[in-house]
Amino acid sequence: MFRSGFIHNTRFNFSKVTTKRLFSSSARPIHSLRIKSLTLGVCGFSAITGLALYNHRLIELDNKKQDISPNISIAVDSSISPFPTALISANQTNLNTDFQLLGYGVRSVTFVNFKVYGIGLYIANDDVNKTKKILSPNYLSTFGTENHSLRELLSDPEFSAQLISKLLEENVRFAVRISPVRNTDFNHLKDGLIKSILAHPESKENKEIVSNGLEELRNVFSGYRGSVPKNHVLWLEILKQGSLSISYENPVKNELTSMGQVKEPIISKLLFLQYLSGKKPLSEPLRKSCNDGFIGL
């Protein structure tokens, strides 16, 4: 349904790169990474999962196990700042725990290949072991399929929904970083979330509950008007028991604003099912990248 805006061919050869922390209020010294020289042909978004490019600084990342140092960042789209691979709650004060990057991608409108925002999906560090147990062969064998491959089950519309639902039921916490690639406003961000939730089949089966939850979501946005410039950030965090915390980051002023919470858990459930499962996920590159992240845990 969605197509990446990164379509190019290029070749790189490098041996040493440096990166720096972006979102710490007390930035640490720049670290150096030594990476063996390589020549890499890149074509399309899916081929650059393991490669970050920012201001001529390159990082080679293993697709199956990313470096989650707080000093490492990932290039999601050339028009916005890279995303950190680790979120430290002591520095990222809008978050309630520490997170590591699970996957990332770009949300696009297919019929015009119109990029909307870059998105990164994170998993709570404290919930990684729980997730590994849920996604273990013992649990996967209960699906009654001949093939218990985690990758194939995560790629299957029906089984992926069951797996993600199980993670959410077991209170595995996730966070999402949304960064518009062009200027927008709070109203468009709110409408996008509402449309995504209503597009999930379960919303029709739970109309009253979903309606109440969406009213909470509208109330969270009710005090926020006006523009959201490109490269600003909307944060979504699933709390225990399924509440959804929403906050806004202005990187120019280095300000974080807590907007509020949606208490009804079906809202966070349907939204994250849309990100991680089903026939038509909100961003196929994000879903594929997160599948790699789950497998690499």
Swiss-Prot record:
GO terms for cellular component: mitochondrion. Keywords: Mitochondrion, Transit peptide. GO terms for molecular function: intramolecular lyase activity. Residues 1-35 form a transit peptide. It holds the Pfam family Chalcone_2. It is found in: Mitochondrion. Belongs to the AIM18/AIM46 family. PANTHER family: FATTY-ACID-BINDING PROTEIN 2 (PTHR47284:SF3). This is Altered inheritance of mitochondria protein 18, mitochondrial.
